[in-house]
A protein has these predicted regions:
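N-terminal nucleic-acid-engaging modules of covalent nucleotidyltransferase systems
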Residues: 1-200, 206-241
Length: 242
């Protein structure tokens, strides 16, 4: 295997070597290429693609999933959600219009559909283990130290261990979202917070709470658990069809 990798790098151009290095080290910041890599791993390791994608999501790394894939499907299945280890975010799919989206979610028209308000903020994932809190971005960058308000909210919630998914944004005095640039500036490296608006977290999903994984639970159970943990002012507004 080492010889094959060495041969691959030897035949690659400098630009291709840089890309390959990013794949190997887990620093590839391109979701589409990450998906292609997962497909290649599944094919070469002869394991289900769905198992590779789930393991990569839970491990927060395609590289970690690839290592497990070559050990077999059981090794992939052994990778689970861990509080304190960032999870690759699940991204929404697009639809041309509301009717098409509703038809896809509820073909018979009888299934309840939860519709969240779209917030133009920064995607955040919040992990809490006792007093320890971790806040990461959509790209899994650690921004805990830059968002003390989010840490404070997390510590105020009535649970010791949880993983929340949500959005963080700056609000005006009357509670309206400010421009995305105002929110984004708060996560910039070495950016001073002096004179800037406070950031408010709004959560729309709960992945784990006090030893209970909710990833595979029905949507209504996850939302009920979210509502029980997070007060209304820190939840994304939601409409559920009848």
């Amino acid at each position: 295997r080492r010889e094959a990798v060495a041969d691959l790098f030897g035949r690659a151009t400098p630009a291709e070597q840089k890309w390959l290095q990013a794949v190997v080290t887990g620093n590839l910041r391109q979701g589409a290429l990450d998906a292609v890599t997962q497909e290649a791993v599944a094919q070469v390791a002869e394991v289900p693609l769905a198992a590779v994608r789930r393991a990569a999501m839970l491990a927060g790394s395609t590289v970690a999933a690839a290592g497990a894939a070559f050990a077999g499907e059981e090794a992939l299945a052994a990778i689970g959600l861990e509080v304190g280890r960032p999870v690759m975010p699940m991204l929404a799919s697009s639809a041309p219009d509301v009717a098409t989206a509703m038809a896809g979610l509820s073909p018979d028209g009888a299934t309840e559909v939860a519709i969240d308000t779209k917030l133009d903020g920064i995607r955040i994932q919040v992990h809490r283990e006792g007093d320890d809190v971790l806040v990461v971005t959509r790209s899994l960058d650690d921004i805990t130290g830059r968002l003390p308000e989010v840490v404070e909210v997390a510590r105020s919630l009535p649970a010791e261990r949880f993983v929340l998914d949500g959005e963080a944004l700056a609000l005006t005095d009357d509670g309206r979202p400010m421009a995305f640039q105002d929110t984004a500036s708060r996560t910039a490296q070495d950016e001073s917070r002096e004179g800037q608006r406070a950031i408010t977290p709004h959560f729309f999903d709960l992945l784990h709470v006090d030893g209970r994984d909710l990833l595979d639970s029905p949507g209504h159970e996850r939302l009920a658990a979210l509502d029980a943990l997070v007060p209304e002012q820190h939840r994304v507004r939601r409409l559920v069809t009848a």
